[in-house]
Regions:
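A short, structured active-site edge motif that brings together acidic residues
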Residues: 91-103, 129-132
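Conserved residues at the C-terminal ends of beta-strands
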Residues: 36, 70-73, 129-132, 167, ...
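Alpha-helix-loop-beta-strand connector modules within alpha/beta enzyme cores
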Residues: 78-97, 149-158, 210
């Protein structure tokens, strides 16, 4: 079971002490809230430097001491490394990044990618290093054949990697296989109240904790869908609960994850300092096993309403992009779900924005040629071409298609 305690002093959060949970393998004291850096604002591949500095600085002020990035997040490692150097904060945080193992064809590639990551992050070691986006034990077996186990041992002995783990997006059964495939220090799983039986799920969380691993949680709000994008009937349930400590859907979702004593830390992709302050205040109060039966019942009723409208389990991560045909895949799926959560006209409006307003010509889902490039990169294993067909049937009866194309022509 995860040990929880508070520290006073330099890492005191505004309004109270910071909650930490202990990594059972290393003894590291990790803030219950970690900063996921992938969603920093900015242009694609170019995170906004000033905003990143402000977010990282405020996070450390609030006691957050775990930062997560990855080689495959365009421009992100460079941004994080430069920010930590400018702010003089590298020694005050635990830094995590990930190996793009699918691009490794020989043992020398492990060194090539890792050395580049150290340069990008302006550091001589990585505190928590992950095999990125494992979906099947076969992926691990492939890099084992290349010599990854000996390579990890050498990096650990040299102090360049402190803790080794993997991020996971596969089936529940394969997750158990992965847990026993190597002497892991930690794992990172997608977990939220809408996903107890999805991917690793609750069974995987318990299995990892039983093996003495630290468990880090990603997508605690399902890419924001459990925050500001709940269907109206679900929002009514939370409003009716009138809980003085849980005033927003995000507060409910994050607190539900923290309620599990097996969770060491959850990552939140915070995009401004206000979110940092709000989530840090929640992290201070959200102790394991602290939610009441009434609160958990409210979550169960929200989940019932959410599942009625969650037609495509897209989190908006963007791994499927760019589409060779220019389709805004996450935007189209968000519009599709909104058409069931709110109304058809609401969804159509969002689809119009995603497909026509922000483009010089209509990038309709009917442009899809089913090349499958997107589906190969989806962590949620969505059959994207097939689901885009659903979007087309929902939003592109003849008149709508004609209007979208005509709108774009008037601007060209």
């Amino acid at each position: 079971m995860t040990i929880v305690f508070r520290l006073a002093g330099a890492l005191m959060a505004k309004g109270g002490a910071v909650q930490y949970r202990v990594d059972p393998k290393s003894g590291n004291r990790i803030s219950a809230l970690g900063l996921g850096c992938m969603r920093f604002p900015g242009a694609p591949g170019r995170p906004d430097v000033k905003t990143a500095d402000a977010i990282i600085s405020r996070a450390v002020e609030q006691g957050i001491n775990y930062l997560d990035t990855a080689y495959l997040y365009p421009g992100n490692e460079v941004c994080v490394g430069a920010s930590l150097e400018r702010l003089g904060l590298r020694d005050r945080v635990l830094l995590a990044t990930k190996l793009p193992h699918a691009s490794c064809k020989c043992v020398e590639d492990f060194d090539r990618f890792f050395d580049e990551q150290l340069r990008r992050l302006r550091t001589d070691h990585i505190d928590y290093y992950l095999m990125h986006n494992i979906t099947s034990p076969a992926q691990w077996e492939r890099v084992v054949a290349l010599g990854i186990e000996d390579w990890i041992a050498r990096q650990k002995a040299a102090g360049r990697i402190r803790m080794i783990g993997f991020s996971y997006h596969g089936s529940a059964a394969d997750f158990l296989t992965m847990l026993d495939a190597y002497e892991w220090d930690f794992c990172q799983i997608q977990y939220n109240y809408a996903g107890e039986r999805y991917q690793a799920g609750t069974a995987g969380l318990l299995a990892a904790a039983e093996r003495g691993l630290a468990v880090f949680v990603m997508e605690p709000l399902l890419g924001g869908r459990l925050a500001g994008k709940l269907p109206p009937r679900a929002s009514v349930v939370l409003d009716g609960a009138n809980d003085p400590h849980l005033r927003t859907p995000a507060a409910w979702g994050l607190s539900w994850v923290w309620n599990h004593p097996q969770v060491t830390m959850l990552l939140s992709g915070m995009t401004d300092t206000a979110q940092v302050d709000e989530n840090a205040a929640l992290a201070d109060r959200a102790l394991p096993d602290s939610m009441t039966a009434t609160q958990l019942d409210a979550i169960a009723r929200v989940l019932t309403e959410f599942e009625k409208s969650n037609r495509v389990p897209c989190t908006g991560c963007g791994y499927c992009m760019p589409c060779p045909r220019g389709i805004n895949i996450p935007g189209c799926f968000a519009a599709y779900n909104a058409s069931y959560a709110h109304s058809w006209f609401t969804g159509l409006s969002q689809y119009f924005t995603a497909s026509a307003v922000r483009t010089s010509e209509a990038k309709l889902v009917s442009n899809c040629v089913k090349c499958g490039k997107c589906a190969r990169h989806c962590p949620q294993h969505i059959d994207i071409p097939e689901r885009l067909d659903d979007v087309r049937r929902r939003f592109q009866p003849g008149p709508v298609t004609a209007v979208l194309k005509a709108f774009c022509k008037t601007r060209s």
